Amino acid sequence: MREVYLLRHGEKDAEGLLTERGKQAAETMRSVLPAFVRIISSESPRTIHTASLLTGEEPHPDPRAAYATTAASVSEEISAIAAEHGISFLDAARRHNNPDVLTGIDEQAHILNGLVDEVLGELGEGERALIVSHDLSIAPAMGYRGMSAESIEPLGGYVISLGDEGSSVQRFVAIAP
């Protein structure tokens, strides 16, 4: 069995950096996670920092683990919608209803799934990899794998497995600090 843990970064502040609570939660989770032979993050400081705290190692930043650049271009507007309605950034992006943003989110979901499939194909039997990404990419990507495309909590995500019987996806729930 080969496994890719696809996790969302830790809790972030208004500037997009990890909060103290987010850092503590990632450090706490480190003790329950398996060893990883590959550690990948987006190029965002919060995903790099999260991956480092989860593993004690520096990740390899990969732009395929990012979130849609079209969403980044209107992130202040989307963040304002999220704050006003008390909803996730992903749900706010959907509510923003900008066709370019929605297309970008969809395209990024396919790119992230391609990265997951590539990494799964490169792992040896019994090996695991970690990819730390963003809710805005993870949820839609897992929607294409038959899971709910709903927003996920910080440090939550999915475990995508590949074995003799094919592939499977299971939800991964973050532990509380």
Segments from the language model and where they lie:
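Internal catalytic-core helix/loop-beta-alpha segment
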Residues: I87-L123
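Beta-strand elements within well-structured catalytic alpha/beta cores of enzymes
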Residues: E3-R8, I40, L123-S133, S137
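Conserved glycosyltransferase catalytic-site signature
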Residues: S44, I48, A109, N113, ...
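Short, solvent-exposed loop/turn segments at secondary-structure junctions
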Residues: G10-D13, P45-R46, D135-I138, E165, ...
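Acidic, low-complexity terminal tails and accessory targeting/binding regions
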Residues: S31-V32, H60, Y67-I87, E125, ...
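Glycine-rich phosphate-binding loop signature in dinucleotide/nucleotide-binding domains
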Residues: L33-P34, V119-E127
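Active-site-proximal alpha-helix that buttresses catalytic centers in soluble enzyme cores
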Residues: M1-T69, A93-I105, S148-G163
